[in-house]
Amino acid sequence: MNVPEINLIAQNLKELFAEKQRDFASKSQEIDATFIKRLMDTEKKAYCKEEFDAKLNKLKEKIENFKKYGLTPSIVIPNGYPEELQKVLSLYIDDMEAKMAVFDVFYNQLAVFDSMISDKALSNKKILLNDNNGIVVVNDNDDRIPLNKLSSGEQNLIILYYKLVFSIRKNDLLLIDEPENSLHAAWLTKMLDDYLDMADRLQCQIII
């Protein structure tokens, strides 16, 4: 039995979520293994309160952004900055920044993909991206719609943008055959603009 391409795309994204979670766990283990040694390093200085607060606020903002796609792991946010714990907390905040950086590129890809699809207004539907299903589409009542029940145009739109955002790399050559197939005319101009923008960012060639 042939699996619809839209379902394969969703499964692929689900696997990417799992891969990034494994990367985060591996990076966390690597960093945590040297925590005591680095804490005892006399050359490591603590941040002043202003620096610490700035870093903490930036970390909180990143965590809130990541929550949208379920990327945020269990994190304890320091409450206060007591003098006797300044070095420990300074090291902790640095470590959390390094751990969360594992998700940076993937989060940006998710955000771009989400934005591109959402801008196309999928006939009173919205797209959700998460680690459980990869891609989920729901209607205005938040009822889930099977991906293979979307119109052919909507499926093609999701597939094309997924390949654009997650498959091509810098200096790649991307060939797109009949992009107008089943797509609403109103989507085409914006889609071409998005493709040109991505080609410029990645310095790649797109042949349509």
Which functions belong to the PLM regions below?
Residues 1-81:
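Electropositive, glycine-dotted interaction segments
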Residues 4, 46, 83, 90, ...:
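Short, well-ordered helical secondary-structure segments
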Residues 11, 21, 29, 86, ...:
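Residue-identity detector for glutamine
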Residues 33-53, 83-97, 122-132:
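Short, charge-rich amphipathic segments
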Residues 51, 60-113:
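Charged, surface-exposed helical/loop "interaction arms" that form contiguous linear patches used
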Residues 102-208:
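Switch/communication elements of ASCE P-loop NTPase nucleotide-binding domains
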